[in-house]
Amino acid sequence: MYSSRKGLFVVIEGIDGSGKTTIAKKLVEKLKSMGYKAEYTYEPFASPFSQALKQYIDTYGGAEPEIETLAMALDRLYHIRKVVLPLLNEGFIVISDRYLYSSIAYQGARGIDLDWIYLVNRYAIEPDVAIYLRVPFDIALERKKQKESKWSYFEDIDRLKKAQDIYEKLVLLNKLVPVDASRKVDDVINECLNIIFDYLGKRKH
């Protein structure tokens, strides 16, 4: 039984409309039904830092890319220390809807140097499994129209396209494992589970 082992940190990445939230939540449901301790979490988290950024954006009509990057890094550190690490220490499989690679993609899309983004996130722990939900841009846009977002500020079309390009570069660098998310949800879930279980199998040896 997995509960006797150290936890597993899995992140689900992709542009808005790729199905991250749906897949992440369904993965947790599926893992729980199989007897694993699993928990869903997300970024930006509901930390004082993300709330401050939201207020800043509301007040000034936007945020400088450097301020945005630093606020997200603070939010991430809070998320790791207060949520992710405690769950991992209790042996949970933690499924995070977005993580560090969202900063690389979305703040990188605003022209921030990627090395600097990595630098200010140097205390962000390495995920065990990082999955990228790959979906054609037009399908993502169509899906995005069907739901309301708390962070629509990040979702203008030009920025999303640039973010998608950066995600694809991260795949080439072997930072992310790509999964075709244009298929039926069950097919996507099954492939993600196979990736997770493949990692668990290797870790046992």
Predicted regions and their residues:
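ATP-binding Walker
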Residues: 18
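P-loop (Walker A) phosphate-binding loop of NTP-binding proteins
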Residues: 15
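Pre-Walker A (Motif I) flank of P-loop NTPase domains
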Residues: 5-9
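NTP-dependent small-molecule kinase module
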Residues: 2-3, 26-28, 138-205
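Walker A/P-loop
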Residues: 21
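ATP-dependent small-molecule kinase phosphotransfer cores
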Residues: 36-122
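Hydrophobic anchor at the beta1->P-loop junction of P-loop NTPases
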Residues: 12
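A glycine- and Lys/Arg-enriched "phosphate-lid" helix/loop adjacent to the NTP-binding pocket
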Residues: 98, 103-165
